[in-house]
Amino acid sequence: MELAKGNAEIQVGIADYKVAASPNRLITLGLGSCVGVVLYDPVKKVGGLLHIMLPDSTQFNNVTKPAKFADTGIPLMIDEIKRLGGIPSRLTAKLAGGAQMFSGLDEKFVLNIGQRNSKMVKEILSRMGIRILAEELGGNRGRTMIFDIASGQVTIRTIGSPLKVI
């Protein structure tokens, strides 16, 4: 994992994560049923942004991208934050995404993946003792998540809505 220098805006892809220190910003696009997880150490001013697609890696035989899943991606990102000096007991979380992007279809067909992603992320964070400070979950529209590490502020851009700071 490379640490960006200076005041960069670092893109986080789908099924990926990035960690960085202040004054960098992390941004991820395309949060539909996916969930964006921001973890932040406000004392050290380091944090990460994870863009998960699925809740549980145990349903798959060969996991080549652990950041794709909540159960493997969150611990992986915490390890990277620790390498930057972050302390797990100080971490707080902010969440966005988990939408139902295919409304109108048979619910059995779409498997409520956004809802399942959100639930799994919350369960994992709870087990790890990480407090969720804010969330922008559910609905039926895509989101962009922008994490300003200097301030800890997360801005959510939702299609058809004004910017929201959480």
Curated annotation (Swiss-Prot):
Gene responsible for this protein: cheD
PANTHER family: CHEMORECEPTOR GLUTAMINE DEAMIDASE CHED-RELATED (PTHR35147:SF1)
Gene Ontology biological process terms, A to Z: chemotaxis
Annotated InterPro entries: CheD-like_sf, Chemorcpt_Glu_NH3ase_CheD, Cytotoxic_necrot_fac-like_cat
UniProt similarity note: Belongs to the CheD family.
Catalytic activity as recorded in UniProt: L-glutaminyl-[protein] + H2O = L-glutamyl-[protein] + NH4(+)
Pfam family membership, one: CheD
Keywords for the protein's UniProt record, in alphabetical order: Chemotaxis, Hydrolase
Protein's name according to its UniProt entry: Probable chemoreceptor glutamine deamidase CheD
An MF annotation (GO) of this entry: protein-glutamine glutaminase activity
Its job: Probably deamidates glutamine residues to glutamate on methyl-accepting chemotaxis receptors (MCPs), playing an important role in chemotaxis.
First-tier enzyme category under EC: hydrolase
SUPFAM superfamilies linked to this entry: CNF1/YfiH-like putative cysteine hydrolases
Enzyme Commission identifier(s): 3.5.1.44
